[in-house]
């Protein structure tokens, strides 16, 4: 995995930013919102290796350590005096459902066999952060991503790495779904 380095305060690993000369930013704190990270923070971008989740699991120290770190994403809450950007909405700990960089994170529990946690958080987000009303989204509907997440999740699966053709199982809202494909077939 490129562009990772170990930041061993408490044994944690985070994705760290570099300045314009390629030097890692000093005094890095994963929960800071800085100009070095677009619309997010180190907690949220840490998981942005959808193409190599197994490599990230190994970097962190294996499945159990990965599960602990992933759990902490949802339980480590911003403090009251943190200056969160406008788009930090739909927060569950450091998970910001109101902004796209976090959307796939819930489904990463599946990659280490903790499917029940994926199912728990998918249901929590669908039931608590979406409303059937004009302003029913908890964040910015960039290119339809908020709605796409909900539609995929309501059907019970999600493309963590969209280019792989692989889908992760979640928590379907319906006992049966039938998709009518452009080629006339149904799925």
Question: Predicted segment positions?
Answer:
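Active-site core of glycosidic bond-cleaving carbohydrate-active enzymes
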Residues: 12-173, 177-186
